[in-house]
Curated annotation (Swiss-Prot):
Residues 65-393 form the PORR domain. GO terms for biological process: Group II intron splicing; mRNA processing; photosynthesis. It comes from the Eukaryota. Residues 402-431, 444-509 are annotated as: Disordered. Residues 1-56 form a transit peptide. Pfam families: PORR (PF11955). It is found in: Plastid, Chloroplast. InterPro entries: PORR_domain (IPR021099), PORR_fam (IPR045040). RNA-binding protein involved in group II intron splicing. Binds specific group II introns and promotes their splicing. Functions in the context of a heterodimer with the ribonuclease III domain-containing protein RNC1. It comes from Oryza sativa subsp. japonica. One of its GO terms (cellular component) is chloroplast. Residues 461-474 have a biased composition (Acidic residues). Keywords: Chloroplast, mRNA processing, mRNA splicing, Plastid, RNA-binding, Transit peptide. This is Protein WHAT'S THIS FACTOR 1 homolog, chloroplastic.
Amino acid sequence: MDAKLLLLPFPSPPATLHHHPPPPKSLFLGASLPLLHPPPPLRLLRPGAPRRLAVVAQAAVKRRKEIPFDNVIQRDKKLKLVLKLRNILVSNPDRVMSLRDLGRFRRDLGLTRKRRLIALLKRFPGVFEVVEEGVYSLRFRLTPAAERLYLDELHLKNESEGLAVTKLRKLLMMSQDKRILIEKIAHLKNDLGLPPEFRDTICLRYPQYFRVVQMDRGPGLELTHWDPELAVSAAEVAEEENRAREEQERNLIIDRPLKFNRVKLPQGLKLSRGEARRVAQFKEMPYISPYSDFSHLRSGSAEKEKHACGVVHEILSLTLEKRTLVDHLTHFREEFRFSQSLRGMLIRHPDMFYVSLKGDRDSVFLREAYKNSQLVEKSKLVLLKEKMRALVAVPRFPRRGVPATSEEADRTNGAAQMLSEGSDVEDDEDEGLSDMEDLISEISGGKSDTDYHWGDGWVGENDDSPPDFEDDDGSSLKEVKVTMKKTANSANGKAHVPVFPDGRPRERW
């Protein structure tokens, strides 16, 4: 008997239950992913059709580190800190400031941790001196030599006002619209040797050359008179001098055309054969004056890069030390139509520029203006800055009885010679000092906050306890003297031999 399957009806839900509609489906956010769509069909090329190859942009020249240029940045680390301290000090009446007020400028000095400011000031005895006025009142001021340097700097900048006006005119003549924001010019204030108050003095005294106009983003400086005699770049002047020198030397050499293009590279620059070929091809291009109209040049073209290199070359020629920060040049992208990769463009032309990565921000040097870390031609302001650097290098505790090395002897002799003549310096308040903590640690002997006894020195503006002038250096010298004395006594004495009480020698274990 076949078994029959009985299908029973499913019991209906009770009448009291309510049917709810199903919840809406959530939106699938991956619907637009390219992996979900089928790839386009491959199109076969016709026989003989040209194939398009992908071109990968690469830097023309690889950057190479050069120690002489990096040493220029390294030796100015302490000088930049001292100049920041000096700028804060000279903003006060009579150029005298209390240590309590100086504690409010820790962030401006790049000090994120608490340091003994008095110990920092005493590390530069040639620049600052700490004096006590009243009970628990400590103030600091410039030394007579540093005071004389500062006054000489102000006097020299006032005398060279005509040269500063010429630099501003040449800078405006190179711009596209012949106008530049004053805020952008302020970034190059120290590099060009402009006085601190140039906005209220130079910009308003010479309406026959330029005037202050209101722009979309603030006041700007606009050119009012074009002088064709100023529209000659430093590269053109150098080319004329080289051509005249070659004319004089041609009488000693057989006058015949060269069979190959000769590339003259600066001393110390080493390039591969391919890099030298690209540098030679760029040099063979016609020179484009930075003062010519460049509105028709297409961005990204070789002609535009030739013009941009000429503009950077001319700006660096106008600076005092023939160098500046790369960030300062990037502020003028709109005025000179610089490319977004300005740093890469400078690296691609090592025969003209050198980009140093030392410090917190990159610096660019005009290569032809330097020889072994030294400027070929130094202005009076640069000489005053070197005298200030000699003051910064004056040691706090000169070593006695120890023959100085040749480097220390040269530095000491140079400092003595420079101090006898008087001096000055240009400040550099725009340059980055985020690595100032490392410099302070080096100056203060690597001591952190916990290494100091905060009850003996200034901690902040609310600390009323007097500082201790006898810092760690004095105690360390005393310990060294005691140790040397003990060592000398032990060396002069006889060796101790173990004996019995009656004087008989005892065997050693």
